[in-house]
């Protein structure tokens, strides 16, 4: 860390500390299965053909709840490879690997096709790029009538 004037920058922060701290927790942010299900209760019309993305999914605590209560395929995206490795192990443990997969990526550079998603989920993670920016950019990836939660 930079000791000049006691100013530290995020570039000097060791992001491995984040992984070490959060890797063995069920969730990497606020929330609970009950909160996930409450938010999900406002979303309807999902089918087995629905495509869902969980942006900033971490190790997948909320993603696995979504998968157990929705049809369709879910892609979880997170910046940290260690979280995605754990995410995919969790999907296998719950026998969800056929419709739930984790990928490493950045929520500010999505690789999804425009207007391809029925639901974009980001439980406690959109703040990483800013709420307004996330809404403005991510809505382009939603099908007409799609949801962002």
Regions found by a protein language model. Name each.
Residues 40, 64-67, 135, 139:
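A structural alpha-helix within SAM-dependent methyltransferase catalytic domains
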Residues 53-55, 59-109:
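Class I SAM-dependent methyltransferase SAM/SAH-binding core
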Residues 1-20:
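N-terminal, positively charged/glycine-rich alpha-helical extensions of SAM-dependent methyltransferases
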Residues 108-119:
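A short acidic, Gly/Pro-enriched loop at the edge of an enzyme's catalytic core
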Residues 133-147:
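A short glycine-rich, Lys/Arg-flanked "PGG" loop and its adjoining helix->strand segment in the class I
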Residues 18-30:
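Class I SAM-dependent methyltransferase Rossmann-like catalytic core
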Residues 29-48:
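Conserved alpha-helix/loop element of class I SAM-dependent methyltransferases that forms part
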Residues 119-132:
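A short SAM/SAH-binding and catalytic strip from SAM-dependent methyltransferases
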């Amino acid at each position: 860390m930079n000791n000049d004037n006691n100013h530290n920058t995020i570039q000097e922060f060791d992001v491995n500390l984040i992984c070490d701290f959060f890797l063995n927790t069920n969730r990497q942010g606020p929330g609970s299965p009950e909160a996930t299900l409450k938010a999900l209760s406002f979303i309807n019309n999902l089918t087995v053909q629905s495509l869902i993305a969980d942006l900033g999914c971490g190790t997948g605590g909320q993603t696995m709840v979504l998968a157990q209560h929705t049809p369709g395929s879910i892609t979880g995206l997170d910046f940290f490879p260690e979280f995605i490795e754990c995410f995919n192990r969790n999907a296998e443990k719950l026998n969800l690997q056929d419709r739930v997969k984790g990928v490493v990526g950045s929520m500010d550079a999505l690789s999804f096709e425009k207007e391809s998603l029925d639901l974009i989920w980001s439980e406690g993670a959109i703040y990483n790029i800013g709420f307004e920016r996330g809404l403005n950019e991510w809505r382009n990836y939603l099908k007409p009538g799609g949801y962002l939660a």
